[in-house]
Amino acid sequence: MPTEWKLFADLAEHAGEKHVTVDTDAGDTVGDAMDELFTIAPDLESRVFDDGELRSQINVLRNGTNVVVEEEGLETELDDGDELALFPPVSGG
């Protein structure tokens, strides 16, 4: 099933696109979809992960819900039609 990633700010720059569609299967997780994203856009991985761990300032959303805070993190199972998003830290002044 096609699953769309929406990428924001410098994450879109690293990927070269704001929207990337990956192929996922029933039972796949957010982490599986992220692995597929890194296959398409390998420059993203070092921006999203540090020493194999998700950087604390990166927000991973599934249908608008932060999977790290409100679901099962990268082990959250995907449903058909899910939209995923990666947000870098937001700062302002």
What residue ranges belong to the model's regions?
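Ubiquitin-like/PB1-type beta-grasp interaction modules and other compact soluble beta-rich domains
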Residues: 1-92
